[in-house]
UniProtKB/Swiss-Prot annotation:
Recorded family membership: Belongs to the DNA mismatch repair MutL/HexB family.
Top-level taxon: Bacteria
NCBIfam families noted in UniProt: mutl (TIGR00585)
A Pfam family this chain is assigned to: HATPase_c_3
GO molecular function, one term: mismatched DNA binding
Transmembrane regions: none
Organism expressing this protein natively: Buchnera aphidicola subsp. Baizongia pistaciae (strain Bp)
Lineage: Bacteria, Pseudomonadati, Pseudomonadota, Gammaproteobacteria, Enterobacterales
Keywords assigned by UniProt, alphabetized: DNA damage, DNA repair
GO biological process, one term: mismatch repair
Functional description taken from the UniProt entry: This protein is involved in the repair of mismatches in DNA. It is required for dam-dependent methyl-directed DNA mismatch repair. May act as a 'molecular matchmaker', a protein that promotes the formation of a stable complex between two or more DNA-binding proteins in an ATP-dependent manner without itself being part of a final effector complex.
Protein name: DNA mismatch repair protein MutL
GO CC terms in record: mismatch repair complex
């Protein structure tokens, strides 16, 4: 797809683009461009709340050399070409105004490498006054890097409206969070003043479970997570409802609703969710949610508002009923019964006498919640009133529910942390110990082997590090193994006399750089070869991944990473390296052989 300037007959039908009024709007536009380019990894670096610099890197399809200049012009886009395309918009952006608006209020450096090029890209520079430089050849990985410098340097009035760095960063943080949640295949990192603030990893598992949200949002009062998965004809809605306690503060509530991957603000859509939940909970619980609705593109009109959050849904009444029905179905499938449990016990006892059911019921059973599941669904006049329950199915099983929700993982149910370094895990009525430090070390090692292209985080050096070549052998070593070094995040600018190190993997401390490079060169002098496994071993020997105290967030991070790389762990046959069964045979034999027992 090539970037073309839209003709007047088409651009006149497009609504005005969003005005760049703060750094958050810059980040929003650049992230949407990255997502539209099919990027799976986006790195965002902010300095001084975005006023000094904003850098957005992605691994998308890139921009061709011939399209670089055109991308900074108004109404230049590759997403639509005619008026007919406005009725079938599948991308987040379509106006071709983002980069042009940003370049008008800042200095911008745009460099990119498309799929056809092999680590050879092109870069252009705009000075903020409409002057665009000639494309220059640069070494570049596949994707695009957009650097925005000195935002509003030529608009002093807008600079005065900026409150503070912290308030602007909070806006950016919310924008990054909302766009990251739009796609679970997207990996996003956010840095502010050279510090890693957020990292949203791409997950194929349920990345919005209750434990993750406890860590991210501090939602300690989540009572129940209700998954939503419902479809009708061409409409489909998925996501999660989070029922919160009535004392839950409104500041920690979150409501994200996405239509075709775009976060939207629509009163009818949000009202449908609240209407369905209120009929079940009778306003006794607050609700937060993350919901994804898929519709045909021709049923939406995105071209009505500059921010593109406010859209027009053609059959809004049908969508309202569909959303309400989907929420009611999900809540009925996993319904939280808030009534007095004695009513349930009384009804069951009565049904036992009527139907002559031959089973023993425990009278002092502690039921804190009950799940009613049905295969079919129809909307009754009075929804799920426990007083009207007259017949309980014989197949219904009651279990003693525990107040604490354990983290359910691929390895089993995580019960507790033992002696600060071990997780006690239960699976299939067996207990296992999960060694946290080894697991973290193993994940770091796998990330190094998979490399930067597969999500390895790198960090820029605060101070420049130069290695001066002692002889031509060292110079040729860096040239020969440049790709394998950059694969693990060791990026060098190589000259005839020295190599300048620009970035390193996240697990390396700056103080160990000299030792690591010396060991790499020493091994090369002896073996005359450098393999990826040897390089990874050298880096891991000098990495700092020791955790003194494993808190809830760190445990969740390691577990989710291990689930992500679970297939690789099985293929390498290193599962026993981090997970071992607990043997109770000696203890049981002791009690059996003890004469006192």
């Amino acid at each position: 797809m090539f970037i073309k300037i839209l003709p007047l007959s088409t651009s006149s039908y497009i609504s005005a683009g969003e005005v760049i009024c703060n750094p958050a709007s810059v980040v929003k536009e650049l992230m949407e461009n990255s997502i539209d380019s099919s990027a799976t990894c986006i790195h965002i670096e902010i300095k001084k709340g975005g006023l000094q610099s904003i850098v957005v890197k992605d691994n998308g399809c890139g921009i061709d050399k011939s399209d670089l200049k055109a991308s900074l012009l108004h109404h230049a886009t590759s997403k639509i070409y005619s008026v007919c395309d406005l009725n079938n918009i599948t991308t987040l952006g379509f106006r071709g105004e983002a980069l042009a608006s940003i370049s008008a209020v800042s200095r911008i450096i745009l460099s990119s490498c498309n799929i056809s090029s092999k680590k050879v890209g092109w870069s252009i520079y705009s000075d903020g006054f409409g002057v665009i430089s000639v494309p220059k050849l640069v070494v570049h990985n596949k994707g695009t890097i957009c650097t925005v410098l000195d935002l509003f340097f030529n608009r002093p009035v807008r600079q005065k409206t900026i409150k503070s760095e912290y308030s602007e960063f909070l806006r950016i943080d919310e924008i990054v969070r909302s766009l990251s949640l739009s796609n679970n295949k997207l990996s996003v990192s956010l840095r502010h003043n050279d510090k890693l603030i957020r990292y949203y990893d791409n997950c194929n598992i349920d990345f919005c479970n209750i434990n993750m949200l406890n860590a991210i949002y501090g939602l300690s009062s989540v009572i129940k997570v209700v998954p939503v998965d419902y479809f009708l004809n061409t409409m489909k809605i998925t996501g999660w409802l989070y029922l919160l306690g009535s004392y839950h503060t409104s500041k920690k509530k979150f409501q994200y609703f996405y239509i075709n991957g775009r976060i939207i603000l629509n009163r009818s859509v949000h009202h449908a969710v609240y209407q369905a939940v209120s009929e079940i909970n009778h306003y006794q619980y607050s609700v937060s949610y993350i919901l994804y609705l898929k519709l045909n593109c021709n049923e939406l009109d995105v071209n009505i508002h500059p921010a593109k959050k406010i859209i027009k849904i053609i059959n809004i009444r049908l969508i309202h009923v569909f959303i309400c029905q989907a929420i009611l179905y999900s809540l009925k499938k996993e319904c939280i019964l808030k009534k007095d449990c004695t009513k349930i016990i009384k009804n069951i006892s009565n049904n036992k006498k009527k139907n002559n059911l031959n089973y023993n019921f425990q009278s002092n059973l502690d039921i804190t919640s009950c799940i009613v599941q049905e295969n079919s669904y129809s909307i009754p006049q009075k929804l799920f009133n426990l007083d009207n329950v007259s017949i309980i199915e014989t197949e219904l099983k009651f279990k003693r529910f525990k107040c604490k929700d354990y983290l359910n993982t691929i390895f089993g149910n995580v019960l507790m942390v033992i002696k600060n370094f071990y997780l006690l895990i239960e699976k299939n009525d067996e207990l296992f110990l999960f060694f946290l430090p080894r697991a973290k070390s193993l994940i770091c090692e796998l990330k190094l082997k998979f490399g930067v292209k597969n999500g390895l985080l790198i960090k820029k050096l605060r101070k420049k590090y130069f290695y001066f070549f002692k002889n031509n052998t060292e110079y040729h070593f860096f040239l020969r193994f440049y790709e394998i070094l950059s694969h693990v995040g060791l990026n060098f600018n190589i000259t005839l006399k020295y190599a300048e190190l620009n970035s390193i993997p996240f697990m390396i401390d700056d103080t160990n750089l000299g030792i690591i490079i010396s060991e790499i060169l020493y091994f090369f002098k002896i073996k005359r070869e450098m393999s990826l496994s040897r390089l990874v071993t050298t880096i891991m020997n000098h990495s700092k991944i020791l955790v003194k105290y494993w808190d809830h967030l760190q445990v969740l991070s390691v577990i989710s990473e291990c689930e992500k790389y679970y297939k690789s762990i099985l293929e390498l046959n290193v599962i026993s390296y981090i997970l071992q069964p607990i043997n109770f045979d000696s203890t049981v034999n002791f009690f059996k052989n003890d004469s006192k027992v």
